[in-house]
Swiss-Prot record:
Keywords: Lyase. One of its GO terms (biological process) is D-glucarate catabolic process. InterPro entries: Aldolase_TIM (IPR013785), DapA-like (IPR002220), Dehydro-deoxyglucarate_dehyd (IPR017655). This is Probable 5-dehydro-4-deoxyglucarate dehydratase. Pfam families: DHDPS (PF00701). Belongs to the DapA family. It comes from the Bacteria.
Length: 303
C-alpha cells in the first residue's frame, strides 16, 4: 500500500495489534502466530499492527521484527499489516527499512528509547525515520515522546508519508488542539491501554478509531462495541463497559505490565498456543487466569 492507501485503511474500521507468539524457550512461534492472525483478519480488521506494543516490541530483537511482519503478511489477506518500529534513530531506520523490504504496509513509530528529548530532537528523529522509507508512518504520542501541535505540523510539511497520529497520553486538550490544527491531513488513532475505556472521549476529540487489545481474544465483542460507538448507541456501549471492560480493567490493574500479559492470557484461553510473555513482564497467576476465563464466558471461540 502507498501512504494514502494505508491512511484510508486506518480510518475504515476497528484496528488491533496481535500478541507475538513464543514457544516454551521464548523463540518466535510462527505457526501459531499465523493461525491467530488469520483468525483476527477474518473479523474484518482493516489494519493489524504486527510487533507493536501488545506484540511485545520492547522485548524483540530488531532482526526478529521483519520475520514477524512477514509471517503476518502471509495470512492477512486483505488486512493491511503495519509494523512496530522504534528505539534510537539509527536502529529505527534499520527496522523501518527491513520491514518495508518484507512487505509491511506502514510503520508505527513508538517512542524512542529511555531518554526525554526536546521538541527539536523529536522532530529530527521522526523526520529521519519517515524519510528513510516510502511506506506510510504513524507516530505514537506517549511517555517520553509527546509532540506538540506545531512540531507535528512541521513534520507533516516535511514528510508526505506521515499519515497517522496515535495518542496514548490521555491529554484530551492536546489532542483536540492537534485535530483542530491538522484537520484531515492525518488519520487519528486512539492508543490508550484498553482503548475502549476512553473511546467515547476520544471520539469527541476527532478520533474515529483506535487499536483494540481485547480484539486479540474477543474480536466479536470488540466489533460490537465499536459499531455501537460509531452509531451513537451509548446504552450499548455502557452495557459492554460494565459487563466486560471494567471487570477486565480490574484484572489488568492487578500488576504492572498486565495490559499485555492479560491479553496474551486471553489468547491462550481461546485455544491458541501463544506461549508466555518475555521478561521483564510476567504472566497471570492461575487465579487470575480463572477470573479472565469466567469473564470471556460466552465469547469462547468455537472449536
Amino acid at each position: 500500500m502507498n501512504p494514502e492507501q494505508i491512511k484510508t485503511a486506518l480510518g475504515s474500521g476497528l484496528l488491533s495489534f496481535p500478541v507475538t507468539h513464543f514457544d516454551a524457550e521464548g523463540r518466535f512461534a510462527a505457526d501459531s502466530y499465523r493461525e491467530h492472525v488469520e483468525w483476527l483478519a477474518g473479523y474484518k480488521a482493516p489494519v493489524l499492527f504486527a510487533a507493536g506494543g501488545t506484540g511485545e516490541f520492547f522485548s524483540l530483537k530488531p532482526d526478529e521484527i521483519p520475520t514477524i511482519v512477514a509471517a503476518a503478511k502471509e495470512v492477512a489477506g486483505e488486512t493491511a499489516i503495519v509494523s512496530g518500529c522504534g528505539y534510537g534513530t539509527e536502529i529505527a531506520v534499520d527496522i523501518a527499512r527491513s520491514v518495508e523490504k518484507v512487505g509491511a504496509d506502514g510503520i508505527l513509530l513508538l517512542p524512542h528509547y529511555l531518554i526525554d528529548a526536546p521538541q527539536e530532537g523529536l522532530y529530527a528523529h521522526i523526520k529521519k525515520v519517515c524519510q528513510s522509507v516510502g511506506i506510510g508512518v504513524m507516530v505514537y504520542n506517549r511517555d517520553n515522546s509527546v509532540l506538540q501541535a506545531d512540531t507535528l505540523a512541521r513534520l507533516c510539511d516535511e514528510c508526505p508519508n506521515l499519515v497517522g497520529f496515535k495518542d496514548g497520553t490521555g491529554d484530551i486538550g492536546l489532542v483536540r488542539q492537534i485535530t483542530a490544527k491538522m484537520g484531515d491531513r492525518l488519520m487519528y488513532l486512539g492508543g490508550m491501554p484498553t482503548a475502549e475505556l476512553f473511546a467515547e472521549a476520544y471520539l469527541g476529540a476527532g478520533f474515529t478509531t483506535y487499536s483494540s487489545a481485547v480484539f486479540n481474544f474477543v474480536p466479536g465483542l470488540a466489533n460490537e462495541f465499536y459499531a455501537a460507538l460509531r452509531a451513537g448507541e451509548r446504552a450499548t456501549c455502557e452495557r459492554i463497559l460494565v459487563d466486560f471492560f471494567y471487570p477486565f480493567m480490574a484484572i489488568r490493574n492487578r500488576a504492572k505490565g498486565y495490559a499485555v500479559s492479560a491479553v496474551k492470557a486471553g489468547v491462550r484461553l481461546q485455544g491458541f498456543n501463544a506461549g508466555p510473555v518475555r521478561a521483564p513482564l510476567k504472566d497471570l497467576t492461575n487465579e487470575e487466569i480463572g477470573m479472565l476465563e469466567a469473564l470471556i464466558g460466552t465469547h469462547k471461540r468455537k472449536a
